[in-house]
Amino acid sequence: MKVLWVALVITLLAGCQAEEVKPAPEPEVQLGQEWPGWQGSQPWEQALGRFWDYLRWVQTLSDQVQEELLSTQVIQELTVLMDETMKEVKAYREELEEQLGPVAQETQARVSKELQAAQARLASDMQDVRGRLAQYRSEVQAMMGHTTDELRDRLASHLRKLRKRLLRDAEDLQKRLAVYRAGALEGSERSVSAIRERLGPLVEQGRARAATVGTLASQTLRERAEAWHQKLRGRVEEMGTQARDHLEEMREQLDEVRAKVEEQGTQMRLQAEAFQARLKSWFEPLVEDMQRQWAGLVEKVQLAMATSSTSAPSENH
């Protein structure tokens, strides 16, 4: 068991040292593309995907609607999604720690510290995204009446960089949690194997003793030894069955958590669609009214120009 956790710690420390090396320049990734290579199925991974999907949906809206939403709505929605993601990460980490069982306290504390550091980096990346949108909103408000194309380009560039960093740290956390979970499952299996190894010699001793008693004693002693042997073997099988049932229960709990997250994802998607429909119903009358006012203004200007052109020759005469 200790050898397993020593190997686990070496793996995590090697990952930390690898992070200190500066990575090679990454190719540019457009915000509209999907997460490359992201195959997450855990609740926290799906929550993180919903965070970025919502941000990409906001960027597909028109300029006027987007600037109106950035006043309060988008920042609040991103905050809720960010909190949901970090909550799922924390819940998944605590669940793995419960499955870990009794191990060396120093080793468990070191591994837990590494996971908390990776979790903190992911939270910092998401806060940077939210802060960049808040800064963009302030700059847009300060430049009312001027072109905001430069600000939008700067925002897109910053979000691309933040997205790369967010993806890198999310993959790092995903790998660490996978190693952590593998260690927990392997530790449980090793515990079952250790029990079988300890009881195996006892079973063999029981068989040998039963054979010896059978040759030296009566048939009654032989039957009692055989009964003891059967009882001991039944106990070993029962302990093995309990261990397998425990592993199966753990898998069922993970499936239940995954189903709940999928249900939440469906609800959020329906809420987003309803919200989009409300936006459309709000702004379509406004746009139509502006078009009518503009058409009336153009008509008045044309009429005024026609009047001035007819009055000018009469004044010359």
UniProtKB/Swiss-Prot annotation:
The UniProt record lists the keyword Signal: yes
GO cellular component: chylomicron remnant; endoplasmic reticulum; extracellular exosome; extracellular matrix; extracellular space; glutamatergic synapse; Golgi apparatus; high-density lipoprotein particle
Region described as 8 X 22 AA approximate tandem repeats: spans on this chain: 80-255
Chain spans, region Homooligomerization: 266-317
Pfam families: Apolipoprotein (PF01442)
GO biological process, one term: high-density lipoprotein particle remodeling
Sequence repeat coordinates: 80-101, 102-123, 124-145, 146-167, 168-189, 190-211, 212-233, 234-255
Binding residue positions for heparin: 162-165, 229-236
Keywords assigned: Chylomicron, Endosome, Extracellular matrix, Glycoprotein, HDL, Heparin-binding, Lipid transport, Lipid-binding, Oxidation, Phosphoprotein, Repeat, Secreted, Signal, Transport, VLDL
Residue ranges, annotated region (Specificity for association with VLDL): 278-290
Keyword Metal-binding: no
Matching PANTHER family: APOLIPOPROTEIN (PTHR18976), APOLIPOPROTEIN E (PTHR18976:SF2)
Entry protein name: Apolipoprotein E
